[in-house]
């Protein structure tokens, strides 16, 4: 169970880092938002799911 928690936390940190870099790049590019809207929404949905997963796994470990 601890390994699953550590992997979920690592995935959350990696997704946060990727979104931290990619979202400003998408907004700064001339046609970025209209062409990459689905990618940003998918990344945000993944991030929200990982936040809940880490919370659930944390409650099972503690």
From Swiss-Prot:
<keyword id="KW-0812">Transmembrane</keyword>
<dbReference type="GO" id="GO:0009539">
    <property type="term" value="C:photosystem II reaction center"/>
</dbReference>
<keyword id="KW-0602">Photosynthesis</keyword>
<keyword id="KW-0472">Membrane</keyword>
<protein>
    <recommendedName>
        <fullName>Photosystem II reaction center protein Z</fullName>
    </recommendedName>
</protein>
<dbReference type="InterPro" id="IPR036512">
    <property type="entry name" value="PSII_PsbZ_sf"/>
</dbReference>
<comment type="subunit">
    <text>PSII is composed of 1 copy each of membrane proteins PsbA, PsbB, PsbC, PsbD, PsbE, PsbF, PsbH, PsbI, PsbJ, PsbK, PsbL, PsbM, PsbT, PsbY, PsbZ, Psb30/Ycf12, at least 3 peripheral proteins of the oxygen-evolving complex and a large number of cofactors. It forms dimeric complexes.</text>
</comment>
<comment type="function">
    <text>May control the interaction of photosystem II (PSII) cores with the light-harvesting antenna, regulates electron flow through the 2 photosystem reaction centers. PSII is a light-driven water plastoquinone oxidoreductase, using light energy to abstract electrons from H(2)O, generating a proton gradient subsequently used for ATP formation.</text>
</comment>
<keyword id="KW-0934">Plastid</keyword>
<dbReference type="GO" id="GO:0042549">
    <property type="term" value="P:photosystem II stabilization"/>
</dbReference>
<dbReference type="InterPro" id="IPR002644">
    <property type="entry name" value="PSII_PsbZ"/>
</dbReference>
<keyword id="KW-0674">Reaction center</keyword>
<dbReference type="GO" id="GO:0009535">
    <property type="term" value="C:chloroplast thylakoid membrane"/>
</dbReference>
<keyword id="KW-0793">Thylakoid</keyword>
<keyword id="KW-0150">Chloroplast</keyword>
<dbReference type="GO" id="GO:0015979">
    <property type="term" value="P:photosynthesis"/>
</dbReference>
<keyword id="KW-1133">Transmembrane helix</keyword>
<dbReference type="Pfam" id="PF01737">
    <property type="entry name" value="Ycf9"/>
</dbReference>
<feature type="transmembrane region" description="Helical">
    <location>
        <begin position="41"/>
        <end position="61"/>
    </location>
</feature>
<comment type="similarity">
    <text>Belongs to the PsbZ family.</text>
</comment>
<keyword id="KW-0604">Photosystem II</keyword>
<feature type="transmembrane region" description="Helical">
    <location>
        <begin position="8"/>
        <end position="28"/>
    </location>
</feature>
